[in-house]
Every structure is written in structure tokens, then in C-alpha cells.
Swiss-Prot record:
Organism placement in taxonomy: Bacteria, Pseudomonadati, Pseudomonadota, Gammaproteobacteria, Pseudomonadales
SUPFAM superfamilies per UniProt: Ferritin-like
Annotated protein name in UniProt: 3-demethoxyubiquinol 3-hydroxylase
InterPro entries in UniProt: COQ7_proteobact, Ferritin-like, Ferritin-like_SF, Ubq_synth_Coq7
Binding site for Fe cation 2: 94, 146, 178, 181
EC number: 1.14.99.60
Note accompanying the cofactor annotation: Binds 2 iron ions per subunit.
GO biological process, one term: ubiquinone biosynthetic process
Reaction(s) catalysed (UniProt annotation): a 5-methoxy-2-methyl-3-(all-trans-polyprenyl)benzene-1,4-diol + AH2 + O2 = a 3-demethylubiquinol + A + H2O
Length: 215
């Protein structure tokens, strides 16, 4: 998205509404990259493993819903045009993850969390509030959030059996992308959050993971 393009408040509202619909409606997010799972064979999974992996992928899908909302909220209140553009571009990249996770959840015979609209609204508000404080805080929040996501992905990869190469391929590529997003945010001047703040974010993230594993 061009940094020199100017939008009216109504334009921005419509763009935000479009983003919310693309994030929350089933099959509405179109990935720019094909899923890494496409080239991987189907592995034989027990019924118990299938349910567990579906729960983990549902958590990851909701995490991507939160990331979309966070970026969109921040882009709405970012002060510098280049920061706003960076947020919008990052949100577009996260669409890939959103679509990949949903595809895999459906393949495992399950569905995304019904709590997604709630978490979208909460994350959008947090992102907008961070942007109102300062661009540096906003970028720092991105870095800290992506660091938390990487930890969750590592935990999930440790639980997913090697036989499920499709799910593992998705999460491995997501981890690469999320780590890059964190590095980009810090390189752009993001504030490095202190450990107590990160701990608080981690505790809040546990609320999301516990609630969306099954519903």
C-alpha cells in the first residue's frame, strides 16, 4: 500500500470493516502464498492426536485473528505514514497464516473458534491504544507479541507428532515469518518491553489459548 495515498476517515472505516470481515468470515482470507502443507503427505494419526492437533491449530488460528486486529488497530492510530504502511503490510502477510491454519483445521475435521470475534475486538482496541501512545510503543508491542507467538509455536511443534508433516510445515513457516516481523519492528525503532510487561502479556495469552483449544 502506497505511503503517499491519503484516505478520508470514511475510507479508513471501510477498509477496517473489510479487513474484519476477511479475518472473521470462513474462507474469506485469500493467501498470497500457497500453504506449505500442500507438498507434504498425509500422515496416519490417531483420533486422539487428530483432536489434539486440531485444538492446537485452532489456537494458532485465533492467534492470527488477534494479530490481524492488532495490526489494523495500530495502523488506524499510527502517527507516521511509514509506520502505518508497515502495519498494513504486516497484516497482509498474516493473512497467509490465517488461511493456512483454517485450511488445516478443516482438513482435521474441526472448525475455528467461535470466540474469534471477541478476541478480534479486544486486540483491535489494544492495537489502537498502543498507536495512540506512540509509534515506538506500537512497534515494541508488535515485537513483544511476535516473540510470544514464536514461543507458542515452539511449544506446539514439540507436541505435534512427526507423522503430521502438514501441520508441522505450516507452523515452521509461520515461526520464520513471525520472527522476521519481530526483528523488523525493533529495527524500525520499536521499544524493547521489560520482562514484567512481557510476563503480563504471556498471562493474557494463556487466557486465549485455554479458551480456544476446545471452543
Amino acid at each position: 500500500m502506497s505511503a503517499d495515498r491519503h484516505y478520508s476517515p470514511i475510507d479508513r472505516f471501510l477498509l477496517q470493516a473489510d479487513s474484519a470481515l476477511r479475518t472473521l468470515l470462513p474462507f474469506s482470507g485469500q493467501p498470497a502464498r500457497p500453504s506449505p502443507a500442500i507438498v507434504e503427505p498425509d500422515g496416519e494419526l490417531s483420533e486422539e492426536d487428530t483432536r489434539h492437533i486440531a485444538g492446537l491449530m485452532r489456537i494458532n488460528h485465533t492467534g492470527e485473528v488477534c494479530a490481524q486486529a492488532l495490526y489494523q488497530g495500530q495502523s488506524l492510530t499510527a502517527k507516521l505514514p511509514e509506520v502505518r504502511e508497515a502495519m498494513e503490510e504486516a497484516a497482509e502477510e498474516e493473512i497467509d497464516h490465517l488461511a493456512w491454519c483454517e485450511q488445516r483445521i478443516r482438513q482435521l475435521g474441526s472448525r475455528p473458534s467461535v470466540l474469534n470475534p471477541i478476541f478480534y475486538g479486544l486486540s483491535f482496541g489494544v492495537g489502537a491504544a498502543a498507536g495512540l501512545v506512540s509509534d515506538r510503543v506500537s512497534l515494541g508491542f508488535v515485537a513483544a507479541t511476535e516473540d510470544q507467538v514464536c514461543k507458542h509455536l515452539d511449544e506446539h511443534l514439540a507436541q505435534i507428532p512427526q507423522e503430521d508433516r502438514k501441520s508441522r510445515a505450516i507452523l515452521e513457516q509461520m515461526r520464520i515469518d513471525e520472527e522476521q516481523h519481530s526483528s523488523n519492528a525493533l529495527a524500525a525503532g520499536g521499544l524493547r518491553f521489560p520482562a514484567p510487561v512481557k510476563l503480563g502479556m504471556s498471562l493474557l495469552a494463556k487466557v486465549m489459548t485455554k479458551s480456544t483449544y476446545r471452543i
